[in-house]
């Protein structure tokens, strides 16, 4: 596991979540999604109808619920082993990614570290915990193996969309798209070039995604990342 992650920049664990734990996490995911949408609508926010992609940052109290489950220490120790860090040193933040059936949109190739504070070298990974089948048809993750060893690539606006900042020139020949069944997990390094496809399946693609961060290393001079000004607010740079 550790050797594969170091070489390829990602690793998939098909049996990461025992079957008995899956229904509870699926129910928790649905409850959070419903609460967020209802709260936003009540406040006069967006009118989400369930037919688009939805990204939700978990509140601290929701993260604490997950940390108290058997999933919590399992996630922390697995991520720490892959990053070569002490489990207690990790900061872990949670999100929910929801891609609606047949209409959930693709995300362009990018590197997570390219969207983080350029004053640091980051040592982190994303853990994608599938709650539905995540396959090439349902918008599964697409990885460029080994690309995490090649530095940060230039990111540009894709298709003129403000929120879609990515890498335009990735050769698809080397890309892999692992298929994950519910309960499987995929871990990828913050410098790995990756994307996700459209959801053309008849089912949603729900996932908990956990950003697991070991302490970053401060640089004497911040790295140039001009795309940050157009793709992120400074509030997103929480380091």
What spans do the regions from the language model cover?
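Non-heme Fe(II)-dependent double-stranded beta-helix
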Residues: 1-8, 14-109, 115-118, 223, ...
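Short, solvent-exposed loop/turn segments at secondary-structure junctions
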Residues: 17-19, 97-99, 103, 114, ...
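Non-heme Fe(II)/2-oxoglutarate
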Residues: 33, 39-41, 48, 154-159, ...
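Generic beta-strand structural signal
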Residues: 88-94, 105-107, 123-129, 139, ...
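Short, structured patches in soluble enzyme cores that scaffold and shape functional sites
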Residues: 111-113, 129-133, 145
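A short beta-loop-beta micro-motif enriched in histidine and acidic residues
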Residues: 112-124, 173-174, 180, 203
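Short, conserved beta-strand element in jelly-roll/cupin
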Residues: 117-136, 179, 211-215
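Double-stranded beta-helix
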Residues: 134-195, 217-220, 235-237
């Amino acid at each position: 596991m550790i050797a594969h992650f170091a070489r390829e920049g990602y690793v998939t664990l098909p049996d990461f979540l025992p079957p008995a734990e899956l229904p509870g996490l699926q129910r928790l995911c649905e409850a959070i999604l419903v609460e967020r949408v209802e709260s936003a609508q009540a406040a006069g926010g967006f009118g989400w109808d369930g037919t688009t992609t939805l990204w939700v940052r978990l509140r601290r109290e929701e993260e604490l619920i997950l940390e108290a489950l058997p999933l919590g220490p399992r996630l922390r120790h697995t991520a720490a082993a892959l990053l070569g860090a002490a489990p207690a040193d990790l900061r872990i933040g949670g999100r929910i990614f929801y891609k609606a059936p047949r209409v959930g949109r693709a995300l362009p190739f990018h590197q997570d570290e390219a969207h983080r504070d350029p004053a640091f070298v980051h040592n982190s990974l994303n853990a994608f915990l599938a709650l539905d089948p995540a396959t090439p048809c349902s918008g599964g993750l697409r990885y460029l193996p080994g690309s995490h060893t090649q530095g940060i690539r230039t990111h540009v606006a894709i298709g003129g969309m403000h929120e879609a900042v990515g890498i335009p020139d990735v050769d698809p020949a080397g890309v892999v798209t692992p298929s994950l069944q519910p309960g499987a997990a995929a871990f990828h390094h913050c410098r790995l070039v990756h994307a996700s496809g459209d959801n053309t399946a008849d089912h949603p693609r729900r996932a908990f995604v956990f950003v697991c961060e070991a302490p970053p290393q401060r640089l004497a001079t911040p790295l140039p990342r001009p795309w940050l000004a157009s793709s992120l607010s400074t509030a997103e740079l929480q380091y």
